[in-house]
Amino acid sequence: MNRRTFLSTAAAASTSVAALAAPMIPIIDTHIHLFDVSRPGGIPWPPKDGPIYTSASPARFRELVKGLNVVGAVEIECSPLFDDNQWVLDVMAKDPVMTGMIGDLEPGHNDFAKHLERFHKNPLYLGIRYGNIWDRDFHAKSNEPKFIEGIKLLAQANLTLDSANPTQQLIADLLRLKDRVPNLRLVMDHLPRLEPTADAAVNKQCDAHLRDLAKRPGVYVKVSGVLRQVDGKVPKETAFYKPRLDTIYDIFGPDRVLYGSDWPNSDHNGTYQEGLKVVREYFMPKGQAASEKYFWRNSIDAYRWVKRDANQPRA
């Protein structure tokens, strides 16, 4: 081992030790999924032949995060079926580890206003998710007046829109949507998964769009789904992910970033602990205040989630 390699390894080890030795900050996980594979009629996701086809319940999540100081979670709906909004609310009502849900409704649907009014009566219903999911065409929909009217209703209700699965086109569409509905509270999920294209001009334009979004009030990003496959392998070293995380942090700063695991979908790329370790090692050296913002404070502003347990923090 040469001197440069030794110093690099020592620095990484020092960062890891410092992060793990820092005061335990309470964590609100803003991105988990709940489903029951034994439900009559089956479920739309995950697929039966996949590695995560095992029921994901609040009890299982609570057991999974024991000892990690994860004190609450927001469920992000993983089904396009209308009735599953109520199913999740019923499941969450029984376990205070769940602080709220982002449901699945179609803003352009004829009954959207009625459906939104129904679910908004439940304080655990924090908003809806719409984006690159369930074969939906966000670009086309975001040009439809009826869709825009639905998003305006969402904003008027003081609820949040979560986007799904970022692309350069989706980022451009979200910026345009924010222009049309300035009071919309927007959370862009899984931003570390945004892959650059082969076109440098497209990437430059996307960077400009992100910087524009970062200037708008009520825009947040999830530093979630961080672990990713590269050439068939999933790196577990924080240093590998640092350049992409640095870019996000440089654009959005400490006040707009949120923690989310994407559990159990994250199990495709590593354990819950492995994913958490990477973001803890990245954020903890930034200091207590910045880490608290990432792990729980910003999530209050983004979601207005419900404190249901004494261990859950409140600003």
Which functions belong to the PLM regions below?
Residues 36-71, 121-136, 184-185, 195, ...:
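Active-site gating loops and adjacent loop-to-helix segments of metal-dependent hydrolytic enzymes
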